[in-house]
């Protein structure tokens, strides 16, 4: 769960059969990312490893844009693989080792092929729900939490989550028995 657990929800690879308690390998790696609920310590829809391509061959940033269009009332926070978001009281700080690859080019624009340094992105859907455009802006290196996060105007659960829970019942049953 990592970063996702602190947020209202997150962009999860829980649909990857290799991550199931009883792992199976789908040789075609034909699985989809899914929106999963978090503990809601911070408002927003979090995408960890934002700059990475997982075993399904899909760049998380690209898929996160699609997820944002399905959940246009939520603010997205994309955290690169080597970046971290530190929150202390009313302030936040982006931690970014400059010797690691990431999606932030020197001019502050996005690199889908990790030609920059790690960073954190803020994503918003602008326009009508069915035709909204996802806008991405680089989060400042530090600032007020109130400027980074915002509460959702609408939330819709991902209907695919039930299917994943059905495919991976052992993990759910193990948690229930505790």
Residue ranges of model-derived segments:
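Catalytic nucleophile loop
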Residues: 1-8
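C-terminal and late-domain segments of enzyme folds
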Residues: 12-178
């Amino acid at each position: 769960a990592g970063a996702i657990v602190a947020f209202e929800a997150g962009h999860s690879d829980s649909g990857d059969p290799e991550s199931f308690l009883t792992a199976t390998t789908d040789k075609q790696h034909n699985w989809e990312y899914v929106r999963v609920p978090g503990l809601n310590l911070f408002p927003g829809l979090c995408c960890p490893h934002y700059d990475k391509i997982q075993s399904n061959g899909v760049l998380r940033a690209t898929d996160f844009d699609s997820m944002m269009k399905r959940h246009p009332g939520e603010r997205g926070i994309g955290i690169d693989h080597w970046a971290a978001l530190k929150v202390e009281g009313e302030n936040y700080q982006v931690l970014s080792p400059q010797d690691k690859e990431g999606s932030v080019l020197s001019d502050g624009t996005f690199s889908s092929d990790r030609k920059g340094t790690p960073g954190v992105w803020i994503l918003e859907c602008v326009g009508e729900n069915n035709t909204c455009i996802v806008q991405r802006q680089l989060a400042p290196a530090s600032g007020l939490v109130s400027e980074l996060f915002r509460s959702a105007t609408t939330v819709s659960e991902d209907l695919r989550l039930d299917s994943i829970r059905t495919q991976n019942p052992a993990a759910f049953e193990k948690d229930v028995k505790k």
